[in-house]
Amino acid sequence: MKILVDENMPYATELFSRLGNVQAVPGRPIPSDALADADALMVRSVTKVNEALLAGTRIGFVGTATAGTDHVDDVWLQQQGIGFSAAPGCNAIAVVEYVFSALMLLAERDGFQLRDKTVGIIGVGNVGSRLDARLKALGVRTLLCDPPRAERGDAGEFWPLEKLVAEADVLTFHTPLNKSGPYNSLHLVDAELLAALPDNRILINACRGAVVDNAALLQALEKGKKLSTVLDVWEPEPELSLPLLARVDIGTAHIAGYTLEGKARGTTQVFEAFSRHLGQPQQIELASLLPVPEFSQIQLNGPLDEGKLKRLMHLVYDVRRDDAPLRKVAGQPGEFDRLRKHYQERREWSSLRVQCDDSASAELLHKLGFLTA
């Protein structure tokens, strides 16, 4: 059995070779000659999986090592009897930590305490729910907007988007991209919403680029809208608006979910799903795959304040390390994808053990995801 894997899926060759012969290939584009005799295909979000790619092949299973699936025509796959699995939640922690890094950076620059802000979270799935829990652990007021969950009667208090626009200091978007239907999220942030948004707010998009109307956002910023903006995703990709990049406060190349842990979770989840599909179920212990981090232990003396917390967070990951490279190469052909393909190793807070002499600080750090003694 021949299994094609994206060359940028960590541990894919090591794991999938347990099930067949593995060939690592570029994700954009996938060589057609490699597909000709392949039985299974494992991709990331850069690969559009549809009839145009797979018609006439013998592919019997597709896995995407990503939480999102809008790059996969799963309806067509089902019609063809092709097995399919994604990796829901695999990079949720990474995205949450990206948002925190950005917020802590803006808090330092603009002289505010995150605890004093209200954060509106739009989309309360794997990412949004984890972000909500960690913000609440820090004492931050949150407002949640998730119409599908509200209509299902899920536990929790959900509000219409209009309330978040009016009351939240921060709007952070973590929705899927739905281009039709009752939960259409295409251009959820449009000219009308931007006009209604009070000045001196923060807008974060780390889900899908087209959730925010990039043209409308650029126009608002060009007209003097006072809005701190963090964009990890763009409309379209891999191209992006250079004038918009020049005006956002933080801009990165769709890497919010790119921790080593997140990528490894994606690979292992898809591997386990494929092994079940073959009737050969296997389970992988994530920790057995991961290397020792560059920084693994630190001593915190005294109580934790936001300044110390920012330094701890940024010791593991500082979003500025991804903002500067994009600005340097944006507009050059192929550079957006190159930044993603050759992404510098990034770890999650759970890779750092913090020794504390203050029990309340240790409890908070544990809730935020750090290891504590």
Swiss-Prot record:
The annotated subunit structure for this chain is: Homodimer.
Give a GO cellular-component term: cytosol
Q: Where in the cell is it found?
A: Cytoplasm
Species the sequence originates in: Serratia proteamaculans (strain 568)
Active site residues of this protein: 208, 237, 254 (proton donor)
What's the protein name?
Erythronate-4-phosphate dehydrogenase
Q: What class of enzyme is it?
A: oxidoreductase
Q: Name one GO biological process term.
A: 'de novo' pyridoxal 5'-phosphate biosynthetic process
Which GO-annotated molecular functions does the record name? 4-phosphoerythronate dehydrogenase activity; NAD binding; protein dimerization activity
Q: Which parts of the sequence bind substrate?
A: 45, 66, 258
State which Enzyme Commission number(s) the record gives: 1.1.1.290
Enumerate the HAMAP family for this protein: PdxB (MF_01825)
InterPro entries with a match to the protein in the record = D-isomer_2_OHA_DH_cat_dom, D-isomer_DH_CS, D-isomer_DH_CS1, D-isomer_DH_NAD-bd, Erythronate-4-P_DHase, Erythronate-4-P_DHase_dimer, NAD(P)-bd_dom_sf, PdxB_dimer_sf
Pfam families (alphabetical)? 2-Hacid_dh, 2-Hacid_dh_C, DUF3410
User: What biological function has been recorded for the protein in this entry?
Assistant: Catalyzes the oxidation of erythronate-4-phosphate to 3-hydroxy-2-oxo-4-phosphonooxybutanoate.
* Catalysed reaction, written as an equation: 4-phospho-D-erythronate + NAD(+) = (R)-3-hydroxy-2-oxo-4-phosphooxybutanoate + NADH + H(+)
Q: Which residues bind NAD(+)?
A: 146, 175, 232, 257
Keyword terms? Cytoplasm, NAD, Oxidoreductase, Pyridoxine biosynthesis
Its UniProt pathway annotation is: Cofactor biosynthesis; pyridoxine 5'-phosphate biosynthesis; pyridoxine 5'-phosphate from D-erythrose 4-phosphate: step 2/5
Query: What is the similarity comment for this entry?
Result: Belongs to the D-isomer specific 2-hydroxyacid dehydrogenase family. PdxB subfamily.
